[in-house]
Amino acid sequence: MWGAGTGSARAQAPSPASAAELRIGFQKGTINLAILKLLGALERRLPGRKVVWVEFPAGPQILEALAVGSVDLGATGDAPPVFAQAAGKDLLYVGAEPPKPDSSAILVKPDAPLRSLADLKGRRVALQRGSSAHFLTVQAVARGGLAWADINPVYLAPADARAAFERGSVDAWAIWDPYYAAAEIDGQVRVLATSRGLSNNNTFYLASRSLAGDEATLQAFFAALAEADAHVQGQRQVAAKRFADFAGLGLATVLRVLERRQPAPVAPLTPALVAEQQNVADVFARLGLIPRPIRVADSVWQPRNHLTRKFA
């Protein structure tokens, strides 16, 4: 259920431009948003308003676009909003999905000599900087008894990271679904570790401050998103086929993604989730991977409308 928000962030009035269109940043791999786009459910709930879908390769790019006003709303993993807030970007957390700890992993070649996380020492690890894979790698390195300086991170977007991994330019690849599932289905990888026990792999929805002031639009968005998730859960084969065709993925890959994915209703950030996200920020700050410490609660949306707070 939508309950009272956590933190001190308060929304301002929406900008006049927000009444004309709603621009959503998404990754093709974000199933709920992809299905929402395919169903047209949001467009039906916002008659007379143009919904613009803008595709990005990963969460950091979505939040950069959000920060400069190119999109109004987007979904990312745990690390991108931490990096954005530390860089002074004015964004608000407006919702979160349940954890998906089995949906990201560190991959190696089947015949690689790496057998434990400690074996990452001195190795080149491909990952998207500032992404959930970045936090997974940080946690994995620590679990292996290593310092961050003990590995050689190679910062690449997902498609470039896969190419580097396949040609042997890197020793390991930290990645999330559906890229993870696609690599598994292709059979040319071995899982060194998943994020289970290392990171909950949370998904967050973030909005511009102006959109956060338009609670009716956010209410419509989350209602439509619930409709998309119900479609995924209630018509799994149909949804899988639609998503596979849309994303250019094999059906087996999408079904593998769905096996690891529980129902994903969006809810406000609870105090526990804010604390968990604060830990993500603190870990990055201690390692000097973000320019300054941050207080996550300062960027958590506080809806004014009691109907929005109770919205499910």
Task: Give the positions of each predicted feature.
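N-terminal twin-arginine translocation
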Residues: 1-15
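Short, glycine-/small- and polar/acidic-enriched structural segments
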Residues: 11-144, 153-155, 171-175, 191, ...
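Pocket-lining segment of extracytoplasmic ligand-binding domains
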Residues: 79, 150-154, 159-246
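Secondary-structure end/capping motifs
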Residues: 213-291
